[in-house]
Amino acid sequence: MCCRRVFRLSHRKEGMESARQTKRVRVYVSGRVQGVFFRDSTRERAERLGVSGWVRNLPDGRVEAVFEGEAGAVDELVRWCHEGPPHARVEGVEVEEEPASGGARGFEVR
C-alpha cells in the first residue's frame, strides 16, 4: 500500500514537471488577421498566460508570432490563435517548434 501511494505521487509530479517544461514556437496565422486587433489581443492573452515573446504583421497579410513559456500555456495560446479576437477570421495556423532560449521576458507587439 505504501509503495502504491508513492508511485501515484511520483507519477503526478512527473506530469506536473512536463507541463512546466519551457516550450518555444513560431506561429504564422493567415486569414483576416490584420486590422482586427489580433496583435494587441495576442499580447493581452500572452501576458495573462505568462507567455513571453512577440507578435508582428507581415507584408503578405499574415501575422507572425513567437511564444515561449510553460508548455501548457504556450499550447493554450496556440489554440487561441485558431480563433483569434472577435473580428478576426482565421483561415490557417502554422506552428514551428524552436529550441527554447530560456531568456525571453515580457511580450512585445512589433
Curated annotation (Swiss-Prot):
Key word Kinase present: no
Similarity remark: Belongs to the acylphosphatase family.
Gene this chain is encoded by: acyP
Enzyme class: hydrolase
Entry protein name: Acylphosphatase
UniProt catalytic activity: an acyl phosphate + H2O = a carboxylate + phosphate + H(+)
Keyword terms, alphabetized: Hydrolase
Protein's UniProt keywords contain Nucleotidyltransferase: no
EC number from the UniProt entry: 3.6.1.7
Stretches assigned to the Acylphosphatase-like domain: 24-110
NCBIfam families associated with the record: PRK14442.1 (NF011014), PRK14444.1 (NF011016)
Gene source species: Rubrobacter xylanophilus (strain DSM 9941 / JCM 11954 / NBRC 16129 / PRD-1)
GO MF annotations, alphabetized: acylphosphatase activity
Active site: 39, 57
